From Swiss-Prot:
Assigned protein family: Belongs to the UPF0229 family.
PANTHER family associated with the record: UPF0229 PROTEIN YEAH
UniProt cross-references to HAMAP family, sorted A to Z: UPF0229 (MF_01232)
Name the UniProt record assigns to this protein: UPF0229 protein RBAM_009260
Highest taxon above the source species: Bacteria
Organism (species): Bacillus velezensis (strain DSM 23117 / BGSC 10A6 / LMG 26770 / FZB42)
NCBIfam families hit by this protein: spore_yhbH
């Protein structure tokens, strides 16, 4: 709207859809990014930029299946002529480049003579990444335990009123109310909006009893666990920790590191400090049983032990490990063992665990980075139990 020389206002009309073109393009791009994230989850969960982000809200991750569009110079200046067989359709290939193939981009130890593969580095919200990952995960075999006397208070927006805080205006219901009132006067429109049209979302305080769970995160930090093995184990525990704290109200996590001896450590030390020495896995199982006896009564807690190692255990200790694992399973909902074994070498610990015959025992062997995602799905797969998670809060 503009003013002419005579002082009157003129109303001009234009195609406002053109103003949305940039927004629509952005929306389409974001949708492609989300689809690429979902399709590349097995590779993205072990990206170093995420694991080392310390929980930052936004991280940059490479998405190799998504092209970043740009103009590229055509180095092949030859002209090509193609001829079909007479019944070709749009999109059919009628000719191919006859130029000799070059060596290509360098891979492995050899040097290549071509440019490398470009990939798109996207800024992704850690919350969006977690949403894509956690929607398939759930604590398995979750059971109803003896309730604590403690209850927690939650807020639920479950009512609509005519008065309330400005920040809680329900825009959709307000506009519908205005439209209905204006329609009754013969002028159906969203404008004007009067005070009596305003609708406000309001909340109620809801108290819910707590049923608790504890996860025992056990990691081998001995000398046989190299940089890659520790990175794989910590990647798993990084996502496990974020998953538990995102989806569950009350869950305790105990971090236990071990070599020949086991000790409870802080979360920061668990994810940062390295140690050396030999490997006696029974030490970490004894420490877990001590924690259960001292702090976590099985009658009141759902107990989930997770142990990650490279499987290189003292051979004479394997029989003790099997006995202690069976003792732990009598008090826990599940026992999960993850073995980082990149080269498929002989594992003394895994050979002993093959004799464990209990439905509560689950294991996964990780040979490559994408196996972290598969291990999460395997260990946190929802299984039928006496009481489902949806029936009560944890």
């Amino acid at each position: 709207m503009s003013r002419n020389d005579s002082g009157n206002f003129l109303i001009s009309e234009e195609d406002w859809s053109l103003h949305r073109k940039g927004f629509d393009d952005q929306q389409r791009h974001q949708k492609k990014v989300q689809e690429a994230i979902k399709n590349n989850l097995p590779d993205l969960v072990t990206e170093e930029s995420i694991i080392m982000s310390n929980g930052k809200d936004v991280v940059k991750i490479p998405i190799r299946s998504l092209d970043e569009y740009k103009i590229r110079y055509n180095y092949d200046k030859n002209k090509h002529v193609g001829q079909g067989d007479g019944d070709s359709e749009v999109g059919d290939v009628v000719a191919r480049d006859g130029a000799d193939k070059k060596q290509g981009a360098g891979k492995g130890q050899g040097a290549g003579d071509q440019a490398g593969e470009d990939y798109y580095e996207a800024e992704v919200s850690l919350m969006d990444l977690e949403e894509a990952l956690f929607q398939e995960l759930e604590l398995p075999n979750l059971q109803q335990k003896e309730r604590d006397n403690i209850v927690h208070t939650d807020i639920e927006f479950n009512d609509i009123r005519k008065t309330g805080l400005t920040g809680n205006i329900d825009k959709k219901r307000t506009m519908l109310s205005a439209y209905k009132r204006n329609a009754m006067t013969g002028k159906p429109s969203f404008y004007p909006i009067y005070p009596e049209d305003l609708k406000y979302k309001t909340w109620n305080d809801v108290t819910k009893p707590e049923s608790k769970a504890v996860v025992l995160a056990m990691m081998d930090t001995s000398g046989s666990m190299g940089v890659w093995e520790k990175y794989m184990a910590r990647s798993f525990f990084f996502w496990m920790t974020r998953f538990l704290r995102t989806k569950y109200e009350t869950v305790d996590i105990e971090f236990i590191a071990h070599h020949t001896e086991a000790k409870v450590v802080s979360e920061e030390d668990f994810f940062s400090k390295g140690e050396s020495g030999g490997t006696i896995c029974s030490s970490v199982y004894r420490k877990s049983l001590e924690l259960i006896d001292e702090k976590y009564d099985p009658a009141r807690y759902n107990i989930y032990p997770f142990h990650f190692s490279d499987g290189d255990n003292l051979t004479s200790d394997n029989a003790r490990c099997v006995k202690l694992v069976n003792d732990i399973m009598k008090k826990s909902n599940l026992f999960c063992y993850g073995e980082v074994n990149q080269y498929n070498r002989h594992s003394t610990l895994m050979s002993a665990y093959k004799n464990v015959k209990d439905d509560k025992f689950k294991y996964y062997i990780l040979k490559q980075k994408s196996d972290v995602f598969q291990a999460l799905k395997s260990f946190f797969k929802n299984e039928e139990s006496g009481v489902s998670k949806a029936s009560y809060e944890i």
